[in-house]
Structures are given as C-alpha cells and as structure tokens.
Design a protein with these regions (language model features):
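Short acidic, glycine-rich loop/turn motifs
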Residues: 8, 97-103, 131-134, 233-238, ...
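Extended helical coiled-coil dimerization/tether regions that scaffold
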Residues: 9, 184-250, 369-383
Length: 383
C-alpha cells in the first residue's frame, strides 16, 4: 500500500482544510527519476517529504495528522494512537486518505471522527461514518484525475450495526485482509526529546561505526528475564549495564538517536513503509541529516519505495531537493496551514534556502517587530 494524498477538515488548530500530496505535482524529467519512486507508468511518489517552518508554526501538528491517517488505514484503534491528540475536542473531523493498493487500484477512505469527554475528563474518539471509493489506476486518464472521485458512488459504507467492529477502528480492515495489504509505520514522534535506546536484538555494526567510530561493541542480552547491555569502546574494558537509560552517561544523544533512527531506516527501506521524524536535525549534525535524506532519495537503494516524512528548521536541507513539490511550507497565522512549495515557487532553479531565509516565501522568518522587542527587553535588563 502506498499513500497518495491525505486531506483533513474540521481540525481545531488548522486555519483551513489540510491537503498533502505524496505524488509529484510538477512534471517529472528523466534526471528526476533517480530520486523518486515509480508507482506505475507515469506516476511517481516522493521518497522524502519535508515540512519546514519557524518555531511554533505547527510542523508537529501536521506530522500528527499524517500519523493519525496512516494508523487509521493500518486498522489501529484511534484511541490507542498517540497522534489522536490533534483531534482535540472536535465534534466532526473528516480525514480522507487516498492510497494505491496491491490490486493496482486507487482508493479513497473517508473517515468522520467525533470526540466525546469521558468521566475522567479525557476525550474518547469514535467513528461517526465511513465510506470507501475505488477505481483501477488503468482508468485514470492523467495525474490531474488520480485522486478525483467526483460523481462516483462509494463501493462500501460503514454499517455501525456490525458488532465485531470497535467504534474507533476503521472498516478498512476488511479491505486490507481481502487485498492482503497493509502499511508499515515507523514513528520517531515520541523520541523527539527523549533518547532511551529500546531493546533490540540487532544493532548493525555499520550504523555504530558511522555514528561513533570509537565504539567496538554494543548489544543487548536477555538472561532469565533480565536485560543486560554490553558496551565496549576501543582499547577499553567492556561495560555491562542493566538499564538503557544509563547509556546516556557513555554515549552522546546524537549517537543514541542515530542508532534508533538508522535501525528504523533499515526496516523502512526493506518494507517500503513510512518513517516519521519530527525535528530531524535534533541531536544530529548536518552531514548525518543529509545522509539520511539521500538514502531515501537514492532509487537504487530505496527499491521498495520507503518514505521519509520529516519536519525541520534547517533551510539548507531544502537545497538537497532538485524539485519544489517534495517540500511543504508550514505557517501559523491565526491557524496552521501547510502549502506545497511548488505552488509558491514556480521555478526549480532558485536556491531554496535563500528563498526561505530571505522572507520571499512570507511567514518563514521570525517577525522583525518581535526581534526588536526582544532586543530592547534584553538591553533594558542588562542596564
């Protein structure tokens, strides 16, 4: 299963409907094909999707919507999904997830969700209604109509009388079983500010050597229900730990996050799934970040169409992209918006980092007035 597009209406934090495309919007040249994933014929998907914006612009919120939509089509109960918080207390949120399945069909799943407060004061979410549309991709005349289901009747609609289905689980579960299809999701959203290495049976030595060449050995061992961590630096004695949190005393945050991230990268490239990373530059130097992005943009390495979806503050990272349509500019001006860069910047030959930092794209640099107020406040406190 490959996600083509996600739209969302009725979200409390958003200024207008959210609309994110994962397939190419601009014309695909021969030289572009090396950094894209070929879906079929002339349809290509972005292997690395960037969401960039200043602090508090809403980048994490956009990532949460994507995570929620992915988990819905994966049959996860909404109330068990961490990203459900993006729904807030909304009474009517409509999420449409467009995807391409194993049968070579383009499908549209529309899920309408409502919040209700429980006795404990927490919101509990349930699906009010659901519909599924589908069409063979062979019947699509051009890219313009790839996700257009205008005038078509749904092939299936949710029947809430079905006792076997929990009211927060999508009825897409039946479609996925029939088509023997699913979507693999790997998320680093919960690791943005927390760096504790989870138990893993296999940490590739190549990953460790890339991140910290002084480490000779790092592995987990389980004996009689207890977990031990073996850590050895070159020319040093082996250290044995029984708590992963203690690794922070010996390894940098970047190394720990790197091991978690690159271990997931290996899984995503193998499965053709999705990796969600918030603040990709957090704890990493620029070279590690660009390496990560380039792995996904290498069509010879990324044969199965693994997709990296990330947020960043790094304008320089935009220059890794030859195209504009794999980048979204996130702004928060009385509500969050996410706009595809190809709609704002028509030419690919303009240096993207310069356009971003110059303020040419609007809402991408901190307001000058806020800067002056901060400067005056600091000056007053020093005197």
């Amino acid at each position: 299963m490959k996600i083509l597009r996600i739209t969302a209406q009725g979200l409390p934090l958003f200024k207008k409907d959210l609309d994110i495309c994962f397939y190419t919007q601009q014309r695909v040249c021969e030289e572009d094909k090396d950094s894209l994933y070929r879906l079929t014929d002339n349809y290509y998907l972005h292997a690395a999707c960037a969401f960039i914006g200043i602090n508090a612009s809403g980048k994490t919120s956009v990532l949460k919507v994507i995570s929620l939509a992915l988990n819905i089509v994966k049959n996860e109960p909404i109330n068990h999904v961490e990203a459900k918080s993006i729904l807030g207390g909304a009474k009517n949120v409509t999420i449409r997830t467009y995807f391409y399945d194993k049968r070579s069909y383009v499908c549209c799943l529309e899920t309408v969700i409502a919040a209700k407060k429980s006795k404990t004061g927490e919101y509990v979410y349930s699906i009010l209604s659901e519909s599924l549309w589908e069409k063979p991709i062979a019947t699509v005349k051009s890219k313009k109509y790839l996700t257009d289901f205008t005038g078509m009747k749904p092939v299936e609609q949710r029947n809430n009388d079905e006792a076997y289905l929990s009211d927060d689980v999508s009825f897409i579960i039946a479609h996925n079983k029939k088509a023997n299809d699913t979507v693999e999701i790997f998320s680093l959203l919960s690791y943005t500010n927390v760096n504790v290495l989870p138990f893993t049976e296999d940490i590739p030595l190549e990953v460790i050597a890339f991140l910290d060449p002084t480490i000779e050995k790092l592995c987990f061992e389980q004996t009689e229900g207890k977990t031990f961590i073996h850590l050895k630096f070159k020319d040093e004695k082996e250290i044995i730990l029984n708590n992963a949190a203690d690794l922070e005393q010996y390894l940098s945050s970047g190394t720990i996050k790197g091991i978690i991230t690159f271990s997931m990268v290996k899984e995503v490239l193998h499965s053709g799934g999705y990796l969600l990373v918030d603040e990709i530059e957090n704890h990493f130097n620029k070279e590690i970040v660009t390496t990560l992005v380039r792995f996904f943009m290498d069509s010879r390495l990324n044969k199965n169409g693994g997709t990296l979806i990330f947020t960043t503050h790094y304008p320089e990272l935009l220059d890794e992209y030859d195209r504009n349509d794999g980048i979204c500019i996130v702004r928060n001006r009385n509500g969050i918006t996410a706009e595809n860069l190809s709609y704002i910047l028509k030419r690919n030959d303009i240096k993207k980092s310069d356009a971003y930092q110059s303020g040419f794209l609007e809402g991408t640099t901190p307001a000058y007035e806020a800067y002056m107020r901060l400067k005056k406040s600091l000056a007053a406190s020093i005197n």
